[in-house]
Amino acid sequence: MMTVTKIEPLSKTRYKVYLDGQFAFTLYKGELSRYHIAEESVIEDDIYDSLQQIITKRAKLRAMHLLSDMGRTESQLRTKLKQGGYAEDAVEAAIRYVKSFGYINDVEYARSFIDSRKERKSKKELYAALVQKGVSSEIVEQVFEEADYGEEDSRQAIAVSYTHLTLPTILR
């Protein structure tokens, strides 16, 4: 049994629920009424387990929706889910779920990112962008080695970037 210590509104319909002083999950207004959740009320273990299942399923669906829009790194997806008000265990379950289907793969993301931009960006720029997106430096190095991205590619990217400059742009 756990005690609801605080219910904090996120929007007109969504609320953050704190159990025993710790953030537990985000619920919709209808779920608060359906499960009779109010501040200082007690939540039985079976209701808590039921809520956890609902929230985990919701996090998985949200992860799938986020990935349908565009490819993301594991770090980016984790951040978006946390920003959406999902608890850590629901976020981890959603990450495991999408990974199990191969919908999220930082190595493939890095390969695609490098292949699509190596004509316009230097190796340093690509490396920095991928690390900023949450891809580990080991994965980035591995993908650069596999792609055989050398100095010639880097020089070509710099040359392409200079061809876009015009005289008035340089003189500004």
Where do the PLM segments sit?
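An alpha-helical, amphipathic repeat domain used for nucleic-acid recognition
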Residues: 1-165, 172
